[in-house]
Amino acid sequence: MDLLNPKIKLEGVKNTIVVASGKGGVGKSTVAMQVIAPYLYKKHGKKVTYIEIDDENNDSRSFTRTEIVNKKMLGTNRLNELDELILMDDNHEVIVDVGGNKTSSLVLDEIKKVGSFGNVKWIIPLGDGELDGKNAIATMKKIKKIEKNPEENIIFALNRAISMDEDYYNEQFINFFGHKYLDSNSVICDFVKDPKYFPVKNDKVITMSRYLGSTVWEMAYNNTDFAAKAIQAKEVGDIESARKYLFFRRIQTEAKDYVLNTLNKIFCDLDRWIEIKK
């Protein structure tokens, strides 16, 4: 079997989702860990293999208490191991979180060498900064040199969206969509007729979850009854502990709201895009 042929569909190889951008600071790890990891865990029913490739920042280390991923760090000096990690892990879904700038180019070059095995999906995150749209399109062009079916297998994540309302985020991400009444060039419609994308709403609960070492999705499904713990602490006169439990209860409630109003909507979009193989 010729493993270098990207058209070959390998039986037993699960989905590999590569989250990549040529620009740093666009929230790749937020999309990978807060959105894609819980989605795959929920659908597949097993821990997700999470490969982070970044010589400068290992954001996944913040998630010290997560129980939905098996984390693996890979430096750019070990990129020749990437294909083996993906190919040999036939029992899990795989997320590859690719660092920005030079790291992104090196990883894409490596994947181009070994082929995509026919099961790779690509997510390109971007913020609403002036250059983010152009950088996302530049990343898409690089992926198109590897991906045989880019129209189906590339999706954009509109990160730190202020609202999930389509009209609102279309204007917030004018750097990506453009606007009929405003001068704009090199926007996505110049290159793709029907691009796939989903907004990821910004919320302070995302920041809080990182400090707690977990994902928002896991926080929402934490079965701890913090209200009961607060009452018990108050009854024994431990007022500070009661306040602490009330604080965690608020975060838990905010996490549940985020799952219901943001993540579940994204999961529906991903359902139409990703075929989950059991």
Language-model regions, residue ranges each:
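C-terminal lobe/tail of nucleotide-utilizing enzymes
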Residues: 2-4, 153-155, 160-278
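Walker A (P-loop) phosphate-binding motif
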Residues: 3-39
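Short beta-strand-centered segment that lines the nucleotide-binding/catalytic pocket of NTP-utilizing
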Residues: 41-59
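Conserved beta-strand segments of the P-loop GTPase G domain that flank and frequently precede/overlap
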Residues: 51-52, 95-97, 122-128, 156-160
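P-loop NTPase switch/communication element
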Residues: 56-71, 174
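Switch II (G3) loop of P-loop NTPases
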Residues: 91-108
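Conserved Switch II/interswitch segment of TRAFAC-class P-loop GTPases
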Residues: 99-103, 119-137
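Conserved C-terminal guanine-recognition region of P-loop GTPase G domains, centered on the G4
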Residues: 112-116, 130-163
